[in-house]
Amino acid sequence: NLDIGLGSPTAIAFGANSHFPEPYRNALFILDWAYGKIFAVHLTPDGASYRGRFEEFVTGRPLNVTGADFGPDGALYFTTGGRRTQSGLYRVRFTGKPKEESGLPALGQTHLEAAKQSRELRRRLEVFHSEQSIEGLGLAWDNLSHDDFWIRHAARVALENQPIKRW
């Protein structure tokens, strides 16, 4: 759960294909039309989901951003326009030298593997949100008190979608 506040989100793009330094290659870029901002959201695995922290990446007035994508040159291209303002196409590229450290917490392999297993369990439970099954019923009951909120939620929804007479 990440609260950036009020705004008018218009688009997102992942930095995986960028030529930006490491923390930004793993970031999710979120465009806000109303406040003229592009946020970089840095995600870290947290159980069956992710946690995020954000920073302002590009800001301006007016900068009513409407869309974004990374080009084959690794630069971020974004467009602006709307409500009688001048439309535009902009390019953001990295020209410096990458830093040694990303500034993000280093996660151990054990933590990453545990988070991966949690996400796989959540996905297994989510199958039973639309499919009735004895296996799904047992899996849901087994995980109703799981430590992870998202797994508990998936288990509850899976249980709610199974016939009550099988409970």
Regions inferred by a protein language model and the residue ranges of each:
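Well-ordered alpha-helical segments embedded in enzymatic catalytic cores
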Residues: 8-11, 139, 154
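Beta-propeller domains with acidic blade repeats across secreted/periplasmic ectodomains
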Residues: 1-127
